[in-house]
């Protein structure tokens, strides 16, 4: 699949249910995290998509610019532009399906999806946030780090080495200039499900709880022992079972 955004191509995939006409069962858009791809951490989105399509849902996921097989460079990403990319995804998918869609997002993608949903609330039937990484603001603006690594090299050479991939100064400067990821999410008042592991080593569980308190339609669940990428079969089964239950409720099924 291909979607245009500001001269670049977002590439992704779509799974269709075998026994239900397109759009009849509902639609789910997955949004990946920082430095990840459309399949999610360790194929989390693919695993979930299989269960969702078996239940009659259509599932779509894209690589954002600078990620996966999409155009662009990771060095050029910014949260603001990634929010606009998610808005573009939501508009395209809801137009194709002729109905609002469910948005499910992980980590920084969850932060950006909450902001995007507030811009197009009528197109988002529900929002599910897994391990929302609101910590990105405190990490950069307060602690001068990204995932525990110091940002001093950015000032010296203009880029941050993120696991072998260069992240540009623009991403850091945008946050330091006062980006408020919470204020920009408040405009979405639809149903929200926030799940966060108590042993998340990247984003402390308090950040998930904050989204649960901030968004008027939100419920918050702390999953005992779960890490940032939900790296056990029981944790992932819990995520998918909960997602199926909520989507059915909100789709009137």
Residue spans of the language-model regions?
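The alpha/beta-hydrolase serine catalytic core
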Residues: 5, 10, 116-118, 122-253
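Short, surface-exposed "cap/lid" segments of acyl-processing enzymes
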Residues: 18-63
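Short beta-to-alpha linker loops that shape the active-site pocket of alpha/beta-hydrolase fold enzymes
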Residues: 34, 58, 63-68, 73, ...
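N-terminal cap/lid segment of alpha/beta-hydrolase-fold proteins
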Residues: 1-26
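Short beta-strand immediately N-terminal to the catalytic nucleophile in serine-hydrolase-like folds
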Residues: 103-105, 130
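Gly/Ala-rich beta-loop-alpha elbow adjacent to hydrolase catalytic centers
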Residues: 105-113
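Catalytic nucleophile-loop/oxyanion-hole region of alpha/beta-hydrolase
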Residues: 67-98
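Conserved catalytic-core motifs of eukaryotic protein kinase domains, centered on the activation segment
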Residues: 40-42, 70-74, 205-206
